[in-house]
Amino acid sequence: MATRYWIAALPVADDNVAAGKTALWARLQEAISRHSFDTPLYRFTVPDLRPGTLDSLLALSDDLVKSNIFIEGVSHKIRRQIEDLERAGGVEPGTLTVDGVPVDSYLTRFVWDEGKYPVNAPLKETVASIQSQVAKIEDDMKVRVAEYGNVKSQLGAINRKQTGSLAVRDLSNLIKPEDMVTSEHLVTLLSIVPKYSQKDWLASYESLDTFVVPRSSKKLYEDNEYALYTVTLFAKVVDNFKVHAREKGFQIRDFEYSPEAQESRKQELEKLLQDQEVMRTSPIAMGAMLATVRVFSSWDAFSSAVRVFVESILRYGSACTVPVCCPSTIYKEREKSKEHLGRAMRQYQQLLEI
């Protein structure tokens, strides 16, 4: 269920700022409830930030549009990465929380963090700090995801070698020591025979060269396309045998049996599987979730707070305003309610819609 938020700043005309804010808040609540009774209204408190000059505010207004687009893009990208990781682990995407509370609660109870963003700092510096932090988070996530992608790629390559056809797959896990004969003069070759040419292979392999050991061929494995056969012959005629086998439509796979190499490949696979699981459940997934929380809080809260402050000054001047946050859930059946809400906000000089 998607939730849409409107952030609006309205001018306070009363000389008594406190009384004016209270009266404006009451009138706004009455208007919203009259036009859209199912839309709750929350205060969105923005501190008295340092506005700077008119020229700086105009420039900052343009920068904030670009900044919000950038931060929003990073937030969505990281969120998609989290969902992909969760699906890869066989779990349903979880609910995003900020500082341990749901997103809705975080926004409707937003409090400006003066320790992170001092209110007396120039707004340009505050915006630059927000964007810099988001850019750093994005760079960190790129490195993490690249590492995870590299492990996935290696596992994919190994999996293709183990599950592909006999013409291309790794044969090491199909061969036993007793299947291979290796001596000073004799060698065992592995022949990939088309599934429907096995009779032809058995009838002809001994005649492909005069130095083939009779009745030495044995079938080790068969898939949907090919069968894997061994054949033992004298080492000096290997090249000649390969040529004749190829002419008959049989593929001789280059293979050297090595228990050490086989064990090494097994350990490599186990390590990659372990690395993938650790990355998915720890540094990548948790890092992505933490990154999303940080980006979300920067984009949907602080960046939006700065933007509504800047736009309110540009539109209403330095007069005091009371920012409010109006969430509206978007459903087709609530389109009429949405229109009523928009009409009510326009009546109260809606400033900003996000």
Swiss-Prot record:
<keyword id="KW-0375">Hydrogen ion transport</keyword>
<comment type="function">
    <text>Subunit of the peripheral V1 complex of vacuolar ATPase. Subunit C is necessary for the assembly of the catalytic sector of the enzyme and is likely to have a specific function in its catalytic activity. V-ATPase is responsible for acidifying a variety of intracellular compartments in eukaryotic cells.</text>
</comment>
<protein>
    <recommendedName>
        <fullName>V-type proton ATPase subunit C</fullName>
    </recommendedName>
</protein>
<comment type="subunit">
    <text>V-ATPase is a heteromultimeric enzyme composed of a peripheral catalytic V1 complex (components A to H) attached to an integral membrane V0 proton pore complex (components: a, c, c', c'' and d).</text>
</comment>
<keyword id="KW-0406">Ion transport</keyword>
<keyword id="KW-0926">Vacuole</keyword>
<dbReference type="GO" id="GO:0000221">
    <property type="term" value="C:vacuolar proton-transporting V-type ATPase, V1 domain"/>
</dbReference>
<dbReference type="InterPro" id="IPR036132">
    <property type="entry name" value="Vac_ATP_synth_c_sf"/>
</dbReference>
<keyword id="KW-0813">Transport</keyword>
<dbReference type="InterPro" id="IPR004907">
    <property type="entry name" value="ATPase_V1-cplx_csu"/>
</dbReference>
<keyword id="KW-0472">Membrane</keyword>
<comment type="similarity">
    <text>Belongs to the V-ATPase C subunit family.</text>
</comment>
<dbReference type="Pfam" id="PF03223">
    <property type="entry name" value="V-ATPase_C"/>
</dbReference>
<dbReference type="GO" id="GO:0046961">
    <property type="term" value="F:proton-transporting ATPase activity, rotational mechanism"/>
</dbReference>
